[in-house]
């Protein structure tokens, strides 16, 4: 398999994984802590030696690969809401990489969170709130806001709001990596089969 395509598909699985977690949280108000940690940790890996360093939890990433099969394959299980969130994330990522000040502030704020992790777990409410504020302060204002659908009772809870924003930041991080690896929106239309085949093979590794 083409190494670049493998890495690009891994990053795309990372985007979908984080988006699906946003959807689950918005509907149910709860998310497995290990899954949350796997996505949030990707934000902090800013200088990886390889793509696999960003996604060490292969079990969680498998869900992202399965979402690729559902969203890009011949499956009838395509989720319109996931597609809507994906379009929003990719649009915000484009705005971010064109904003030198945004990228600089992002790096600085991520360093602050890294220092926090000497004392707290990444899923600690204070850390999650700080990641959420990075999204609100730097990303959210770059373009149209992503409208999250779900259970109104869940969406009113501050901790759920914080986790959703932190996960959107994780999705943006994977989108930046996907683009750095040569990912383009047109690939999602014209190179779907290659992406789906790579996801299938990655699931069996």
UniProtKB/Swiss-Prot annotation:
- How does the protein's chain sit in the membrane according to the entry? Peripheral membrane protein
InterPro entries found in the cross-reference section: HflD, HflD-like_sf
- Main location group: cytoplasm
Question: Could you tell me the keywords of this UniProt record?
Answer: Cell inner membrane, Cell membrane, Cytoplasm, Membrane
Q: Name one Pfam family in it.
A: DUF489
Q: In which compartments does the protein localize? A: Cytoplasm; Cell inner membrane
Q: Which GO terms describe its cellular component?
A: cytoplasm; plasma membrane
Family of this protein: Belongs to the HflD family.
Question: Which protein, by its recorded name, is this?
Answer: High frequency lysogenization protein HflD homolog
Organism source for this protein?
Shewanella sp. (strain W3-18-1)
